[in-house]
Amino acid sequence: MEKAIKKYFPVFALPTLVAFTIGFIVPFIMGIYLSFCEFTTVTDAKFVGLKNYLRVFSDPTFMHALWFTALFTIVSVLTINVFAFVIAMLLTKGIKGTNFFRTVFFMPNLIGGIVLGYIWQILLNGILGHFGRTLTYSSSYGFWGLIILMNWQQVGYMMIIYIASIQNIPGELIEAAKMDGASDWQLLKSVTIPMVMPSITICTFLTLTNSFKLFDQNLALTAGEPSNNSQMLALNIFETFYGRTGWEGVGQAKAVIFFIIVAVIALAQNRLTRTKEVQQ
């Protein structure tokens, strides 16, 4: 059986490989090449070297979007994972209605980002309207609006991952710790957290990448207003590419830089948390 699988593996893998090459590899390579070109369409691309990259770092809107995105990512990763872990701990204590609460917390994750953005825009503007403010009055309003939206959407999904991990902790291990006189805090710090570190790695990776590449919620909630001060990187790239004639190459260069930043941060985070797993 194993020999037959090895024999026909290339036949079954080839369609997937071809689709992956056409749908990802070729566009990715073309995107890198176009980041060194001036163009309005891919057929009139003119190579200009590093000019586009120099224009990227001289563009104040990009640098502001980078710092805004970095701050948003830090806050959202921390809040989402803390809330998700706390809720998961509560829902694994055997309280009544656990399945109902799991469903309720998970449901927002099923709603599309653009829809969520408009829903929360209406809700938050309705609340702020009582104080003569809107989400676009200040970038800080937009920032915390995005944090609330992202938490509401993502906490339920991360909660499910944490619940599965907590339920897999051997009961004998917890009982042994209690018999040794471990307090609730010691039990959490020395048993629960080390045992769920693989889930912490996964959830941190997912929230980090989702936060950094956030686009549709940003577009729907604030559209970068006021004056692009609540604009995140993905939206900045979109508006550079499609909203500024002659800047298509710069937009592509921004996209390449964006990819590198996300890849480096995600790999570093993944390696760091996996190291913690080994140490534990």
Question: Predicted regions span which residues?
Answer:
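A structural signal for multi-pass alpha-helical bundles of membrane permease subunits
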Residues: E2-Q280
